[in-house]
Amino acid sequence: MTILSAITSISRPNKISKSVVSSNGGASLSLSSNSVACITACGGSSYSYSSSYQSSGSGFSYNSSYSSSVGYSSSVGIATGSCHSLCH
Protein backbone atom coordinates (compact mmCIF):
# COMPACT_ATOMS: atom_id res chain seq x y z
CA MET A 1 0.00 0.00 0.00
CA THR A 2 1.38 3.37 -0.95
CA ILE A 3 1.59 6.10 1.63
CA LEU A 4 1.75 9.65 0.32
CA SER A 5 1.98 12.60 2.64
CA ALA A 6 2.97 16.23 2.37
CA ILE A 7 4.04 18.03 5.50
CA THR A 8 4.75 21.72 5.81
CA SER A 9 6.19 23.11 8.99
CA ILE A 10 6.74 26.81 9.63
CA SER A 11 8.55 27.47 12.86
CA ARG A 12 9.57 31.08 12.19
CA PRO A 13 8.74 33.74 9.58
CA ASN A 14 12.29 33.39 8.21
CA LYS A 15 12.51 29.60 8.38
CA ILE A 16 10.31 27.26 6.34
CA SER A 17 10.67 23.51 6.12
CA LYS A 18 8.68 21.50 3.58
CA SER A 19 8.86 17.76 3.08
CA VAL A 20 7.19 15.18 0.87
CA VAL A 21 7.57 11.44 1.28
CA SER A 22 6.13 8.48 -0.61
CA SER A 23 6.60 4.87 0.35
CA ASN A 24 4.90 1.51 -0.08
CA GLY A 25 6.26 0.39 3.26
CA GLY A 26 6.56 2.66 6.27
CA ALA A 27 7.54 6.28 6.67
CA SER A 28 8.59 8.41 9.60
CA LEU A 29 9.18 12.13 10.02
CA SER A 30 11.29 13.74 12.69
CA LEU A 31 12.47 17.28 13.36
CA SER A 32 15.92 18.06 14.68
CA SER A 33 16.70 20.83 17.13
CA ASN A 34 17.09 23.38 14.34
CA SER A 35 13.76 22.40 12.74
CA VAL A 36 15.37 20.76 9.71
CA ALA A 37 13.02 18.11 8.38
CA CYS A 38 14.36 14.57 8.40
CA ILE A 39 12.51 11.86 6.50
CA THR A 40 13.04 8.13 6.45
CA ALA A 41 11.08 5.91 4.08
CA CYS A 42 11.55 2.15 4.19
CA GLY A 43 10.15 -0.43 1.79
CA GLY A 44 10.56 -1.72 -1.75
CA SER A 45 11.17 0.99 -4.33
CA SER A 46 10.69 3.66 -1.71
CA TYR A 47 12.44 6.98 -1.51
CA SER A 48 12.92 9.86 0.85
CA TYR A 49 13.56 13.52 0.21
CA SER A 50 14.06 16.40 2.59
CA SER A 51 14.95 20.02 2.11
CA SER A 52 15.12 23.13 4.21
CA TYR A 53 16.02 26.76 3.72
CA GLN A 54 16.89 29.30 6.36
CA SER A 55 17.54 33.00 5.95
CA SER A 56 18.69 35.17 8.80
CA GLY A 57 20.15 38.63 8.33
CA SER A 58 22.87 38.49 5.68
CA GLY A 59 23.46 34.73 6.04
CA PHE A 60 21.58 31.70 4.81
CA SER A 61 21.72 27.93 4.95
CA TYR A 62 20.25 25.27 2.66
CA ASN A 63 20.20 21.52 3.06
CA SER A 64 18.71 18.83 0.84
CA SER A 65 19.03 15.08 0.59
CA TYR A 66 17.56 12.26 -1.48
CA SER A 67 17.78 8.53 -0.98
CA SER A 68 16.19 5.50 -2.60
CA SER A 69 16.03 1.84 -1.69
CA VAL A 70 16.81 0.85 -5.30
CA GLY A 71 20.44 1.86 -4.83
CA TYR A 72 20.70 5.60 -5.52
CA SER A 73 21.54 8.13 -2.86
CA SER A 74 22.68 11.72 -2.96
CA SER A 75 22.97 14.53 -0.47
CA VAL A 76 24.00 18.16 -0.54
CA GLY A 77 24.17 20.26 2.56
CA ILE A 78 25.28 23.65 3.80
CA ALA A 79 23.82 24.03 7.26
CA THR A 80 24.75 24.57 10.86
CA GLY A 81 22.83 21.51 12.03
CA SER A 82 22.91 17.85 11.14
CA CYS A 83 20.22 15.41 10.12
CA HIS A 84 20.46 11.62 10.05
CA SER A 85 17.94 9.18 8.59
CA LEU A 86 18.32 5.41 8.79
CA CYS A 87 16.29 2.52 7.44
CA HIS A 88 16.40 -0.83 9.21
UniProtKB/Swiss-Prot annotation:
One of its GO terms (biological process) is sorocarp development. Pfam families: Coiled. It comes from the Eukaryota. Belongs to the hssA/B family. This is HssA/B-like protein 61. The lineage of its organism: Eukaryota, Amoebozoa, Evosea, Eumycetozoa, Dictyostelia.
